[in-house]
Amino acid sequence: MKSLVLGLLVGSAIASGPLQHVLHAPPDPEPKPEPEPQVVKDPFEELRDTFDRLRNKAGDIWDDVMDNIPNIMSNMRPLTIPAKKFTRRPDSEWTHIVRGADLEALWVDDESGYKHRKIDGKLSQYDLRIKAVDPSDLGIDKVKQYSGYLDDNANDKHLFFWFFESRNDPFGDPVVLWLNGGPGCSSLTGMFFELGPASIDENITANYNPYSWNSNSSIIFLDQPVNVGYSYSSQAVSDTVTAAKDVYALLTLFFTQFRQYSAQDFHIAGESYAGHYIPVFASEILHHNNTNINLQSVLIGNGLTDPLSQYPFYRPMACGDGGYPSVLDSQSCQSMDNALPRCLSMIKSCYDIESTFTCLPASIYCNNALIGPYQKTGRNPYDVRTNCTGNDLCYPQLNYITEYLNKPHVMRSLGVEVDSYESCNMDINRNFLFHGDWMKPYHRLVPSLLARIPVLIYAGDADFICNWLGNKAWTEALEYPGHAKFAEAPMENLTMINSQGKNEVFGEVKSHSNLTFMRIFKAGHMTPFDSPQASLEFANSWLSGEWSEV
């Protein structure tokens, strides 16, 4: 990110110079006095002045943080992430191995006779090791399954994935990449807790999920960035842009091995911090002209995408204006109101400069001032209707999942190479935060996506942490050609035939110019967990092309 920041600073210095206007001379001009000698300022001096102004601005922001949260430095921990213990499995244990170097070496002729790479991207450092998983071994689902690792051999990074074919028509149904957020939480959590083929009960037993999203699509569950879930590395990833290169490589090598899926529609879906990931990952894919990834849309659930538009809605959601009773007392609500202007000023500084020195203070101050009061109540930040129980993530089911995925038999069946599994790696969470990634304006990538593919933003309306009010606000504020018509579009009912055979309104939707927003009633942060039938209903409708305009 240093080169990006430097580019912005240099741009600021150049833009600060005076503009020259050429005017027609008036008739019969008066004699002009001799001009004063013009002092031409050294451009490097202008650049130094710009750095000084930015340094002073960053210093003021840090002073604000230290004044308001004086113990913050004592809570900071080193950014190093302990390496996981692992045992590399021999190549003979893998069903397929795809070499990125082999793919990068392929050249083809275009219609004009010019040679170009068959597949774009720097792939030579990557391999994909794939294991065919015996469906009867774990009893998760009867469909064809694959697991394995993407290896970045140049940087000692190894990303784990688990793939399930569609229960319906695997050679006709779309393929979906699912990403959990955090940052630092395993997508296997989403698989077993929300939308995958099975859940894990208190007896640490797998139970069939009739509302799995692989009912009508094939799904790749990916543990990313490295050191999340079953993934591992001696290196650390601390920002979303770096992670995008790995995801592009994995998908490219996967579709190279499984050509039967590469012609089918492909979609990226995820929740929470995937509101950061998905715009970047989709942009990385669409950046390449010669690719075997047939990206058709993206879906972001209860995401964090545009903090400047979303953070003003923490107070309304916590204080009774989001459709549920207030969680906080009037004094706490007023405190959040008082803190908001300073918070927004800090986020704007982050947006303007996009450096750690402005984005990190914004994260620290705003999260303490606007999320902290809610967390102190003991209520579930992922569902305002409940208290937080079971563990730090408020759901005891996550403990069952962790215990299941640490079983030696499970790890052996999947070809896992690490010694243990954890659902969320808080060191990674802290690393992204301390590198300023949390507050960065990744929503600015969405307009270019909308020019090529549909984008769905959905939100369970009982979530606090990435609430529906904020998600609706940022979509309505997004600057793109369809902005005005989307903002004024009315909300319409979402309906389905429920399990009792009755017509049920489960949410509301607005859509225009490839952008769609959905509010899902009576669902929290993990929408498919709270509303499994409704989630499958809107997912199937979306993947089949409803609300798409491109």
From Swiss-Prot:
Keywords: Carboxypeptidase, Disulfide bond, Glycoprotein, Hydrolase, Protease, Signal, Vacuole, Zymogen. Gene3D superfamilies: 1.10.287.410, alpha/beta hydrolase (3.40.50.1820). Residues 1-18 form the signal peptide. GO terms for molecular function: serine-type carboxypeptidase activity. It catalyses: Release of a C-terminal amino acid with broad specificity. Its EC number is 3.4.16.5. Disulfide bonds join 185-424, 319-333, 343-366, 350-359, 388-394. Residues 19-131 form a propeptide. Residues 20-39 are annotated as: Disordered. SUPFAM superfamilies: alpha/beta-Hydrolases. It comes from the Eukaryota. Coiled coil: none annotated. The active site is at 272, 463, 525. Belongs to the peptidase S10 family. Vacuolar carboxypeptidase involved in degradation of small peptides. Digests preferentially peptides containing an aliphatic or hydrophobic residue in P1' position, as well as methionine, leucine or phenylalanine in P1 position of ester substrate. This is Carboxypeptidase Y homolog A. It comes from Paracoccidioides brasiliensis (strain Pb18).
